[in-house]
């Protein structure tokens, strides 16, 4: 009798007719390969990884190494518009980006005087990482505005009577997520205030007319309108040094984005490796259930091992505690059931109790039917 080995699930056996020795004899069978054999090669790689857990761990470690912010920062590029370099303070920004360690590209941008961030995925990209980790997502754009240019847009914006998504400085065709930055607006408004009092002559009648019509209350109103209507952030900085710190902070945040995306894509991103993730072993005879119950109590915030031991000693299982809660006649009695349980004091310490806060949280945990209920009022 012929044996069909592993991977021959789609193999069929057929005879070729009658044998030489007569109609009762059968010739050796022939094998015909079905379409399912083509799937063997596709699944062989996954099977090889399953048989080699060490190789799978190495691949996961390499993928996590590529997700480290310092590694992502090397593949991050800040595209700076050429018009920004015409400003005398642009050297401060360029030196800060160079010290950060990311790539800096000087190339024309639209709109002018803007910065963009681009991130390149590693080549080759590890297969163990979800594709959304390296998705480019929404591109960030930071537009630098001169104070007078910003104030002219504010004067236009404050004349609009209703909600609008239109922004004076940014084209509607822009696909990136825009942010605005204005350098020296406070000092500029202060100087314009002295100009209006006649202390010095304005440089341009057009600019002076625009500036006299806009005051700080109108600027603050425009900032609120931009945030509520257009979801647009406006950064007001006093110097190029402050702007450089902000640009570096945004660059570092974008370098941390892939690792955060990877952690959020995991089933339980809050679990860490080691004993905590492994849990408590529970045997078929019930050995270990009390330790698992003690660990569950420890998962509540601000619960020490001594407090957890006090609860588990009084109620060795959650079912016993639930029955005790159901036996309470009033809600107040139910909430304070565990409050007066004594906690063994440490060396030289004073006697303690479980307290009403933890008693209330454990009671709600075992009795509520609302999955969105916030147990910890202090969080």
From Swiss-Prot:
Q: Which BP terms does GO give this entry?
A: double-strand break repair; mitotic intra-S DNA damage checkpoint signaling; replication fork processing; resolution of meiotic recombination intermediates; telomere maintenance
Q: According to the UniProt record, where is the region Disordered? A: 1-55
From which domain of life does this come? Eukaryota
State the Gene Ontology terms under molecular function: DNA binding; endonuclease activity
UniProt key word DNA damage: yes
UniProtKB keywords = DNA damage, DNA recombination, DNA repair, Nucleus
Please give the annotated consequence of changing residue 294 to E.
No effect on cleavage of 3 prime flaps, nHJs and 5 prime flaps
Q: Where is this region: Nuclease-like domain?
A: 50-266
Query: Its GO CC terms?
Result: endodeoxyribonuclease complex; Holliday junction resolvase complex; nuclear chromosome; nuclear replication fork
Annotated localization: Nucleus
Q: What does this protein do?
A: Non-catalytic subunit of the structure-specific, heterodimeric DNA endonuclease MUS81-EME2 which is involved in the maintenance of genome stability. In the complex, EME2 is required for DNA cleavage, participating in DNA recognition and bending. MUS81-EME2 cleaves 3'-flaps and nicked Holliday junctions, and exhibit limited endonuclease activity with 5' flaps and nicked double-stranded DNAs. MUS81-EME2 which is active during the replication of DNA is more specifically involved in replication fork processing.
Q: Which PANTHER family match?
A: CROSSOVER JUNCTION ENDONUCLEASE EME2-RELATED, EME1 PROTEIN
**Self-association and partners:** Part of the heterodimeric MUS81-EME2 complex; the complex forms specifically during the DNA replication phase of the cell cycle.
* Family statement drawn from the similarity comment of this UniProt entry: Belongs to the EME1/MMS4 family.
What name does UniProt use for this protein? Structure-specific endonuclease subunit EME2
Please tell me the species this chain comes from. Homo sapiens
